Structure formats: C-alpha cells, structure tokens
From Swiss-Prot:
Domain of life: Bacteria
Protein name as annotated: ADP-L-glycero-D-manno-heptose-6-epimerase
Complex formation: Homopentamer.
Cofactor(s) this protein requires: NADP(+)
Cofactor detail note: Binds 1 NADP(+) per subunit.
UniProt-listed InterPro entries: Epimerase_deHydtase (IPR001509), Heptose_epim (IPR011912), NAD(P)-bd_dom_sf (IPR036291)
Reactions performed catalytically: ADP-D-glycero-beta-D-manno-heptose = ADP-L-glycero-beta-D-manno-heptose
Gene label: hldD
Any one biological process term the GO annotation gives: lipopolysaccharide core region biosynthetic process
Amino acid sequence: MIIVTGGAGFIGSNIVKALNELGRTDILVVDNLKDGTKFANLVDLDIADYCDKEDFIASIIAGDDLGDIEVIFHEGACSATTEWDGKYIMHNNYEYSKELLHYCLDREIPFFYASSAATYGDKTEFREEREFEAPLNVYGYSKFLFDQYVRAILPEANSPVCGFRYFNVYGPRENHKGAMASVAFHLNNQILKGEKPKLFAGSEHFRRDFVYVGDVAAVNIWCWQNNISGIYNLGTGNAESFLEVAKAVVKFHGKTEADIEIIPFPEHLKSRYQEYTQANLDKLRATGYDKPFKTVAQGVAEYMAWLNRK
C-alpha cells in the first residue's frame, strides 16, 4: 500500500494521478475534507481507501499496524503563507510531520515530504544550506524547522527520507486553494468572468521559479523509485516574470499583452513579498534526475487547456 497525505489537495492529488499512471491504485489518501470541494480532485482517480488526517495521526501515534506500507508521500499541511496562528501551524506542519517521520523510520518505510522555498525568505540565492535559510513567516519557519530536524536524523536513517522544497507550483487540481491558488488560475478566472486580467504594477520585474505540478509529481515518483534521501529544491532552475505567466494565459484566450490591466501593488504585501526565486538544482541533478522541466509558456498552455476543457 502507498499512503499519500494531503492526497485530496493540490500536489497530493497529482501524485495520486502519477501513481495511477504507473498502474498503482492500492493508495490510502489521508486528508481533511472539511473543505468538501476538494473531493473533486479525487473523482477521476482510483484509490483503495480514505482516512481523515486526525484519525490517521491518532493511529500513527498509537503505533497501530496499518498493514504493508511501501512508501508515504507526506503532502498534507497548512500551506497558507498568510496564516499567522503559530500554534496551529507548528502543530499541523511540524509536530504532525515528526510523528509520521518516526513511524516510518521505526519501520523502514520510505518517507517523502513537502518542504518549501519559503524556507529561504527573501534571500537571493536558493541553495539547500543553512546560510541561505531565513523564513519570513511562520509557515516557512515550520518547514525550515522540520528540514533541520530531518538533517539531524538523516545520518542514522536506514530508509529513504527525502524533502522537496517546492517553488511556485501551478497546474491542475488547485481550484480549492482560493487566494493561495496560482496567478495563472486567477487570471484565467478573471477572463472567464469577462473582466480584464489584472497584474500588479512592476510584475515584469517580479520573477519566480514557476514549476508545473506534473513535473513536481514526476520528481517525487522518480526519487522514490531510486531510493533518494536528502533535502532538494524542486523548481525549474529558471526564474520567469509574472508578466510571462499573464502573457501565456491571454495568448490561450486569443488576447494580447495590451488586454492586461495593471493595478497598484498592495502596501500590506510589500514587506512580506518574495520578489525573486530561482531554485538551484545542482543537488537534485546530482542524484541523476535529468528530465527537463516545462517552461512557463509550455506549462501554462497545458494548464489552460485543462482548466478550460469542455
């Protein structure tokens, strides 16, 4: 059996999809469906069972025998960088992850988990080393602290433990994320409502490492199949501007850059906004992973076709 926590969420459901494409359906999805809209991410996927995240962690803490577990992909977390309830974040992201990690270590179950580029804060170099890590929010701190915890235990681990620092992930199955969904998702919605797609002033200068969710799932699967351990950046290694994203969206809809409306940048975001991210992929490439990543033009075109499918 394969377990995917956050399996009804954005990245988790895409990992389930990738597993289905390998012919695997013996999958236990763990999630919190309080937001019932997330069920839509699982409708076209084949899984064996579903478990609520609180019931699942209770079983983990109790040391219950959950059967023969081949691997756990731990994608479940509060991923809102705007959430400032530190007690909630640390319990949900840090403590939960530690319990799951130790369950896996004790039973030598491979453990692959979601970290985040938020661990770097506003640094301008993005390498998986302590000197480049300075998170700006409690979400980033929860991910950073768990990475530090993993670093300390890795030398003693007898089974793979692997964390991925996701950069700006976009693509299918993020509809439930609301304000935290990608820029491409929001621009598409604006166009469908008959509005002009809106970008913040200066968006041509805000450059991020936008990575397509299908590529993210592919790296997770490959690292599992190749018994990779460590903490790795997962982006494309190439920063592109928000304007490039917008241009790819409007192109799909038969519009041009002239159709984009520029709006003022919100004051409250200025001190907490990463202007630039670009994953250094040296460490990931050193594992032997050599597949290319989709560019914004390629990935957004594929995503728009999926979002606007009839």
